[in-house]
């Protein structure tokens, strides 16, 4: 086995020496810059040592620490559900009672924040979606949440132990970290395969029967406990008769026997407004089988299966030179390159999740909890954006620290770098085109609107710009199941169209979402902001090592303020600065997406439904006519939605008014860092230090202004 025993003695001595990982920092502080450098470099293992094995072990060990923190955090969430929540009340009436897991104590009048959440309880309404997740998992009591919270703490302790053990007692050798095929097999078959299989098993044996009874209106306290379903097959057979046959249908290939609890329905459950849980159980079982197969595809101890190095080196087309040759070496020796790819893919996937959470709501009653829908969409969009910017950051660090041009001749990476001017200038042209045209459509509409010429505007009632391709995609997906899945009762998502609206408890869960001129316009703003973000980030990566302006950029490192004295106009060109600028455009892009989603859903989807079947949308369907002008966005969205919060003082909503104000203060504070020069502050500090010297109270550690890069980092964080 490839481990080294007792490589590093366990001791707390280093904890008492801040900066022990760096010769300069270990000397202690001379100026206040020291504390900033300490924070910047503490986790930059690559700057502590060049030994790849040691770096890998530190990262591996840190991952266990990260998992421990996640377990503690989740434990806290579940504990709040067990101790401070109205979960059991919500479970008995999810359409009228709002989820709450936090009660504010009566200190200085804060208890005004506790609103009436229904069911006789007062508290703060939560929008995390955890109640809906717990119901889907089959949790029926606060005691079960309590047990889960304790279990998570035990797992956290286990993770902390593993982190210590695999660094101090049995540390893997470098060869273990570089054994790609074995890692793929274990991650695919173990994490994704057995992980999905165990979840499918839990769903079939615990979640489905409990949810079936809950949907039928059985009191949660009457429902058998999870272990009873697991241990007593007759209980399950009462709900799903085929359970009485055990595994016989599986081995006799008579799988259709199981179609009671492994379904292929499509659409939403009309009782809960969520996906059919029998569909999701089926899905997880299918996914598990795919990944279990995938986990046996790579060549390890037996001479069969794929070798990744061989696949990559064979991968070349007629116009791509050496193709993927050399990439295997990059990905097994540069963890930054590996991380960049993983962040890009995971970030994109997270954004895909954001869009599926509302169009295919996976948990019961999630779709009618509009605040939660909005929160989950916002959360997943932001996380996805951060991960994608992180991908560019680590790709640039790879270029600066790990890229070796001598081993990369005429392969795809080299060829991309050689024609980077063409890539960047074409991308720049695309950004200019998208920016002028998308914004120009709005400006045209504002002008026509101001001049009183509505017949000359781009709108659904005047000059139409219908998103015909999007409508075609919607239509195809609405009709497809008819021929591809004849037994399915509905298409994958209600949003495609063709079906009816789904209403739960007098509220719209989901309906076919109409797309028109307004969506066409804002879609092109999305295209514009995303392309600009990509332009900035990609330029940062492609020019991380050198440029016409600074040919020796690689020697200056990942982050530097300027190319030294006597070279004016070379500031803010480091790879770090590109990440910094890219972040702003990422914020920009995602703000527009969240605005679009928020208004579109309130205008065209969310609302109440009368006994006669009349739908009243929250903002009365005003998106199509109002969002086609900039003025409409400002007046009918930003102001209309913010005014309630701004006027919330003295009500149970006042926390949001204070947060709204506070967030804008923090944002304004960021501008102080972003719009000021370092010299200004250094000058000011020197005057203040002079005064301290006069009074003989000057500190030993000299105060210094933040460096340019530090100031911008503080600024972008507050922004």
Swiss-Prot record:
EC primary class: oxidoreductase
SUPFAM superfamilies with a match to the protein in the record: Photosystem I subunits PsaA/PsaB
Co-factor remark: P700 is a chlorophyll a/chlorophyll a' dimer, A0 is one or more chlorophyll a, A1 is one or both phylloquinones and FX is a shared 4Fe-4S iron-sulfur center.
Keyword Iron-sulfur included in the entry's annotation: yes
Catalytic activity entry: reduced [plastocyanin] + hnu + oxidized [2Fe-2S]-[ferredoxin] = oxidized [plastocyanin] + reduced [2Fe-2S]-[ferredoxin]
Record: residues binding [4Fe-4S] cluster: 562, 571
Swiss-Prot/TrEMBL keywords: 4Fe-4S, Chlorophyll, Chloroplast, Chromophore, Electron transport, Iron, Iron-sulfur, Magnesium, Membrane, Metal-binding, Oxidoreductase, Photosynthesis, Photosystem I, Plastid, Thylakoid, Transmembrane, Transmembrane helix, Transport
Entry's Gene Ontology BP terms: photosynthesis
Binding site for chlorophyll a: 672, 680
EC number(s) stated in the UniProt entry for this protein: 1.97.1.12
The keyword Nucleus belongs to this UniProt entry's keyword annotation: no
Transmembrane segments: 59-82, 145-168, 184-208, 280-298, 335-358, 374-400, 422-444, 520-538, 578-599, 653-675, 713-719
GO cellular component, one term: chloroplast thylakoid membrane
Membrane topology, from the record: Multi-pass membrane protein
Positions bound to phylloquinone: 681
One Pfam family of this chain: PsaA_PsaB
Record: residues binding chlorophyll a': 664
Localization in the cell: Plastid, Chloroplast thylakoid membrane
GO molecular function: 4 iron, 4 sulfur cluster binding; chlorophyll binding; metal ion binding; oxidoreductase activity
Domain of life from the UniProt record: Eukaryota
UniProt record similarity statement: Belongs to the PsaA/PsaB family.
Function: PsaA and PsaB bind P700, the primary electron donor of photosystem I (PSI), as well as the electron acceptors A0, A1 and FX. PSI is a plastocyanin-ferredoxin oxidoreductase, converting photonic excitation into a charge separation, which transfers an electron from the donor P700 chlorophyll pair to the spectroscopically characterized acceptors A0, A1, FX, FA and FB in turn. Oxidized P700 is reduced on the lumenal side of the thylakoid membrane by plastocyanin.
Assembly description: The PsaA/B heterodimer binds the P700 chlorophyll special pair and subsequent electron acceptors. PSI consists of a core antenna complex that captures photons, and an electron transfer chain that converts photonic excitation into a charge separation. The eukaryotic PSI reaction center is composed of at least 11 subunits.
Official protein name in the record: Photosystem I P700 chlorophyll a apoprotein A1
Organism, as annotated: Encephalartos lebomboensis
